[in-house]
């Protein structure tokens, strides 16, 4: 095959590559996009294809500062490749496509398909229509056509899965454009959610993450304010489901019945990611966050009382318009009081289309950077101190795939503790597969991981490990590896590695 017509076609079958940017909702949607394409006869391009697939799909994010620059830079990189290969197709979906529907094809006329957040199920049809009509297809739905979970899927993990319980958001945070792009909250019926989870468990999945822009508001669309706590308890009754997580909740909707369900349901993990955004009441009001510092710390206190070993993480924005030094000191105060295991910190930057972008009092970059560095230094210190408390504890880890970048050179494997802390452990003589469970003693703590340097105390082979082994064997003869444009995407870990819900990300 000449360099002029380089292609990743396999045996005459067209190949695809999906590149994902943004939150867990996009990761979940990308698994559906992959499933739709495989259902239509495409196969995944080999690992590291770098735009050489027959179809390249960008699932975009609209809330990162340079989201559009990144997209158009990547599209520009593909333009000469497509010029050499007329049969190649490029599709752009996700939040940026929903927002910039009218400009993408104008700025990148070599794009074949533009689709939004509400009609991902149309991708194969739009690709075929663009091929036949030889012109770009731009189709954006204004409301959800089908829950992503009802579409075919190509899950990135054999043992862990996302399960969408709702889409959209009813909040109006002034820094966030997500509600405008994903619409008002719409809840799935509990029976549909539980049926999907049971089907996943039957396939070997042992860990699920309940997913929504605001998971603990679940039930508002179906008229049941305790629907989320009931859903957690129902997950506890599913045989074979070992771990349940959820992301992301909103402090306004965090009620006592949810805390009780977390504490009383054994397979709901002792982990909570709850965005703070700011510790200042004045800034929270400007953000339109619907809670104040006292309310937030009160939830933390209740969670710690009910679940003493819970690992709590958060999102924080530094330098929101109008933030004073006193406001920032209030954020530092909450960080000291809450003692987060981890905090995902962001420097505020204008998001076009959001009220905050037009606010007075935009903070100079130098000031934002200085505050950001102080916050990161404080949180690093706290994360390390909290991790040191884990030394000497005996923990059950679910063995993870691809978590430890240095595992090969250190002869270690990696896994997740119940509270989602990352643990690197000594590789045992007995075969251990992703999805299996090992028991180890923690011997060392760093700010972002733990070590178990002694021998593994126990290895429990699981149905999840069986599922991984079966899938791995089946994949051996196929082209492998679609590059999702996120680091560490594939397994829902660490949650939220790239935050969703009410976060800025």
Swiss-Prot record:
Broad class of the protein's primary localization: cytoplasm
Keyword terms: 4Fe-4S, Cytoplasm, Iron, Iron-sulfur, Metal-binding, S-adenosyl-L-methionine, Transferase, tRNA processing
Residue ranges constituting the TRAM domain according to the UniProt record: 388-456
PROSITE patterns per record: MTTASE_N (PS51449), MTTASE_RADICAL (PS01278), RADICAL_SAM (PS51918), TRAM (PS50926)
Positions annotated to bind [4Fe-4S] cluster 1: 23, 61, 95
Localization terms from the record: Cytoplasm
Positions of the Radical SAM core domain: 155-386
Quaternary assembly: Monomer.
Protein name: tRNA-2-methylthio-N(6)-dimethylallyladenosine synthase
Species classification: Bacteria, Bacillati, Actinomycetota, Actinomycetes, Kitasatosporales
């Amino acid at each position: 095959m000449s360099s002029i017509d380089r292609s990743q076609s396999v045996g005459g079958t067209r190949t695809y590559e999906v590149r994902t940017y943004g939150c867990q909702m996009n990761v979940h949607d990308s698994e559906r996009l992959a499933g739709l394409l495989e259902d239509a006869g495409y196969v995944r391009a080999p690992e590291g294809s770098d735009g050489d697939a027959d179809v390249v799909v960008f699932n975009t994010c609209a809330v990162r500062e340079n989201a559009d620059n990144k997209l158009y830079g990547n599209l520009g990189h593909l333009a000469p490749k497509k010029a050499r290969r007329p049969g190649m197709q490029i599709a752009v979906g996700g939040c940026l496509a929903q927002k910039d529907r009218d400009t993408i094809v104008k700025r990148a006329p070599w794009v074949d398909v533009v689709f939004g957040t509400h009609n991902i199920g149309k991708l194969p049809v739009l690709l075929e229509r663009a091929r036949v009509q030889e012109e770009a297809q731009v189709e954006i739905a204004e409301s959800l056509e089908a829950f992503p979970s009802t579409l075919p899927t190509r899950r990135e993990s054999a043992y862990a899965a996302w399960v969408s319980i709702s889409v959209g958001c009813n909040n109006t945070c002034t820094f966030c454009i997500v509600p405008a792009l994903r619409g008002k909250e719409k809840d799935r019926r509990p029976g549909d959610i539980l049926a999907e989870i049971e089907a996943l468990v039957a396939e070997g999945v042992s860990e699920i993450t309940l997913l929504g822009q605001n998971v603990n508001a679940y039930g508002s669309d179906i008229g049941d304010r305790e629907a989320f706590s009931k859903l957690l308890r129902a997950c506890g009754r599913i045989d074979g489901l070992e771990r349940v997580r959820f992301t992301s909740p909103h402090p306004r909707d965090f009620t006592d019945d949810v805390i009780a369900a977390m504490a009383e349901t054994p397979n709901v993990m002792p982990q909570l990611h709850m965005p703070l955004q700011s510790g200042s009441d004045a800034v929270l009001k400007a953000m339109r966050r619907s809670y104040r510092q006292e309310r937030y710390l009160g939830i933390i206190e209740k969670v710690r009382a009910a679940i003493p070993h819970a690992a709590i993480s958060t999102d924080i924005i530094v330098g929101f318009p109008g933030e004073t030094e006193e406001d920032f000191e209030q954020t530092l105060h909450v960080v000291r009081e809450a003692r987060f295991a981890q905090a995902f910190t962001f420097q505020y930057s204008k998001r076009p289309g959001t009220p905050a972008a037009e606010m007075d009092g935009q903070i100079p970059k130098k000031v934002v950077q200085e505050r950001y560095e102080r916050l990161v230094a404080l949180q690093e210190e706290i994360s390390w101190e909290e991790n040191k408390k884990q030394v000497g504890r005996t923990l059950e880890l679910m063995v993870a795939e691809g978590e430890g970048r240095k595992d090969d050179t250190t002869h270690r494997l990696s896994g997740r503790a119940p509270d989602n802390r990352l643990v690197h452990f000594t590789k045992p003589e007995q075969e251990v597969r992703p999805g299996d469970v090992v028991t180890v003693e923690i011997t060392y703590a760093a700010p972002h991981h733990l070590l178990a340097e002694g021998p593994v105390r126990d290895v429990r082979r699981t149905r999840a490990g069986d599922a991984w082994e079966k899938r791995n064997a089946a994949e051996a003869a196929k082209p492998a590896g679609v590059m999702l444009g996120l680091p560490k995407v594939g397994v829902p870990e660490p949650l939220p590695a790239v935050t969703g819900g009410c976060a800025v990300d």
